[in-house]
Amino acid sequence: MKQIFIGIIRFYQKFISPMTPPTCRFYPTCSHYGLEAFQKHGTFKGFWLTCKRILKCHPFHPGGFDPVPDKKDDKVNS
């Protein structure tokens, strides 16, 4: 499932994005953010993080540097 989403993002980057002017207000761009989110966090959390990022991409948000959060270790150290 993760590979399907990564394939969709890569298709967008290769065929759709070059036809539009660069307008992303974030670094890394939303598509690069999505790729990294899926690679770091897997399907479900990657999808959630990517959706949150795309919803922030509007003229009223200042944008800027917004990296993918690091994966939290689920183990509790005692």
Curated annotation (Swiss-Prot):
Predominant location: membrane
Organism annotation: Bacillus mycoides (strain KBAB4)
The name this protein goes by in its record: Putative membrane protein insertion efficiency factor
Primary role: Could be involved in insertion of integral membrane proteins into the membrane.
Topology versus the membrane: Peripheral membrane protein
Family indicated by similarity: Belongs to the UPF0161 family.
InterPro entries: Membr_insert_effic_factor_YidD (IPR002696)
GO cellular component, one term: plasma membrane
Localisation: Cell membrane
Pfam families: YidD
Entry keyword set: Cell membrane, Membrane
